[in-house]
């Protein structure tokens, strides 16, 4: 329902501005408490977002936009994917695409690192997977900032003692910051046994995404306790987007050892 409301609102924005043909994209901010939607940006042109949408769906937005601008209609153009349906058919996909922004605040020391609706990223990474965990972890690695997935991060003020109140306050303080690596602190909070409900109350993240991160952390814990000789577990880890390097870190062994075990069990990348 929320998606349909956005779709209809996007068309209304295009008509109001006067975009009759070509590529365009509209971006919204959504209040998670009441569903209120606000238009924060509209690009009446083929943009970087259009390029990512093309990669994600296989629909050649720039090419179609150019042909429309010279007088063709969508019904006259062939769908490049199916080869027999017109381009007016909206693309449907059976996989998950994740886009994550790339921030380099370390290069811009005078810039406020607090995130808002103002664009502060210098680029983004996109990944495709058969499920969210796989797509998400692949996207994190694609940022090329040294992550193997939901890597552990240190939390200032947290100690390994049983000072529960002090540790809770330290975790809560980091979660309250709207910062680029907030997702890693959320994962760390889950590792420290903070509930999804508590994290949602602090961050306002949708519980679905928090539950997906919870599943990744649960798999981490299962991997730490079990042997990699268990083929079903290793296969589950790979299907959930864990790289050989990430598994090696969990088991405190070399990446080469993980790769050898994986190949021994005939677990190899496949393409649909």
Residue positions per predicted region:
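ATP-dependent carboxylate activation and anion-phosphoryl transfer catalytic cores
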Residues: 1-233, 240-241, 265, 269
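C-terminal amphipathic alpha-helical interaction region
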Residues: 233, 245-272
């Amino acid at each position: 329902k929320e998606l349909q409301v956005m779709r209809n609102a996007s068309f209304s924005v295009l008509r109001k501005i006067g975009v009759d043909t070509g590529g365009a994209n509209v971006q919204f901010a959504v209040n998670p408490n009441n569903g209120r939607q606000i238009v924060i940006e509209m690009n009446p042109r083929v943009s970087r977002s259009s390029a990512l949408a093309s990669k994600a769906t296989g629909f050649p937005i720039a090419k179609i936009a150019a042909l429309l601008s010279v007088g063709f209609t969508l019904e006259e153009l062939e769908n490049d994917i199916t080869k027999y349906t017109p381009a007016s058919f909206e693309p449907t996909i059976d996989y998950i695409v994740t886009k994550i922004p790339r921030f380099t605040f370390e290069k811009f020391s005078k810039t406020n690192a607090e995130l808002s609706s103002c664009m502060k990223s210098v680029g983004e990474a996109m990944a495709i997977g058969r499920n969210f965990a796989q797509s998400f972890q692949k996207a994190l690695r694609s940022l090329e900032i040294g992550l193997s997935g939901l890597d552990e991060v240190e939390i200032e003020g947290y100690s390994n003692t049983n000072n529960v109140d002090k540790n809770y306050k330290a975790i809560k303080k980091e979660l309250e910051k709207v910062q680029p690596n907030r997702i890693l602190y959320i994962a760390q909070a889950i590792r420290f046994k903070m509930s999804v409900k508590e994290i949602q109350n602090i961050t306002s993240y949708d519980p679905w995404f928090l539950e997906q991160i919870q599943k990744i952390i649960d798999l981490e814990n299962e991997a730490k306790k079990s042997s990699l000789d268990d083929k079903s577990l290793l296969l589950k880890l790979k299907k959930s987007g864990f790289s050989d390097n990430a598994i090696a870190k969990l088991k405190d062994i070399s990446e080469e050892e993980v790769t050898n075990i994986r190949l021994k069990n005939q677990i190899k990348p496949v393409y649909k």
